[in-house]
Amino acid sequence: MFNDNTNKMNRSILDIQASALVISQFTLCADTKKGRRPSFLNAESPELSKKLYEYFKVSLRKRGMLVDYGQFGSLMKVKLVNDGPVTFVLDSKQ
């Protein structure tokens, strides 16, 4: 998802030897179409979400990625620099 020398998105995080920051964020599933508060009915249960989060962490480590992690389910102040302005939403449902 990173540009090569021809400005095409042909390089991976492993190719460019960058690091990633993995943070759980259930608010990405918020439905804000109705009312004054977001609905989180589409979010997965906390139990399954934590298992998936841990699985994802292990998967990245196995691939040799340099990764830092947030603590699942905790409130955090996160400072980062995005390499963008590109954002991808990765959906595992097939």
Predicted segments with their positions:
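Short, low-complexity, polybasic intrinsically disordered segments
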Residues: D83-Q94
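Short active-site-adjacent structural elements
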Residues: D31, K77-K79, T87-F88
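Compact, glycine-rich, soluble single-domain proteins
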Residues: M1-Q17, T27-V58
